[in-house]
Amino acid sequence: MTIIDKAISRKRLTELAQNFYGEMIKGVVDIDRQIMALDAELHSDLEKLLLENGSNQESLWGINLYPDVEGDDFIEFDSLI
């Protein structure tokens, strides 16, 4: 699991996706702090990482990223965590 606080390339996202799901990577975004956690099997693991690092629960959203997909289908908004 890693916290991302700056731009990340699609190539790096593709590499991270191989750790669990191959074509998809789970993430949790802190919309207030403008950071996200990536690279875990479960959104709840990423949520916990962000909470332990100062995020507030009400600011967290779960997402799925599909690095090899273009356009709107690149990101899937999963839920408010």
Residue ranges of predicted features:
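Metal- and O2-centered redox machinery and metal/ROS homeostasis
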Residues: 5-6, 19, 58, 66-67, ...
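Negatively charged, low-complexity tracts enriched in Asp/Glu with abundant Ser/Thr
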Residues: 8-49
